[in-house]
């Protein structure tokens, strides 16, 4: 995905301290084991922001007992052309304009954090897909991603 690499996720199993309360055992583990999860986010600020919103936040919500953690996307008109298709799923910073369509932040570099302040959300652009003006695209509002 772009922006958002590299992303690391894992779990470390450890023996619970004597007398300590262990978490509920998962399949194949004993009651005396506990799991600690870790996430490694990318170094560029926009990459970290996007991967946190799409992967880490939903994971933390699920750990907290939430069930419906998937953000609801809306379909909006692209008022721009993105001729260069990327081989990866790309999340473009965009905002809703006065006409109700979407406009792109001019610089989609993962180092430009101001694109996240300027924008209203992310366009979820599938791999190898160029966007034409007037096309309907999948938009994830920050209000959905941030809760």
Regions found by a protein language model. Give the residues of each.
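Flexible glycine/proline-rich
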Residues: 1-147
């Amino acid at each position: 995905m772009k922006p958002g690499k590299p992303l690391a996720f894992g779990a470390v199993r450890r023996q619970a301290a004597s007398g300590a309360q262990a978490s509920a055992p998962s399949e194949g583990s004993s009651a005396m084991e506990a799991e600690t999860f870790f996430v490694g986010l990318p170094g560029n600020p926009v990459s970290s922001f996007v991967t946190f919103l799409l992967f880490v936040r939903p994971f933390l919500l699920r750990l907290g007992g939430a069930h419906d953690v998937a953000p609801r996307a809306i379909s909006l008109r692209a008022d721009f052309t993105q001729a260069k298709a990327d081989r990866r799923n790309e999340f473009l910073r965009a905002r809703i304009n006065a006409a109700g369509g979407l406009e792109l932040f001019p610089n989609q570099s993962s180092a430009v954090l101001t694109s996240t302040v300027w924008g209203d959300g992310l366009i979820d652009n599938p791999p190898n897909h160029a966007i034409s003006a007037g096309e309907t695209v999948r938009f994830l509002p920050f209000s959905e991603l941030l809760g």
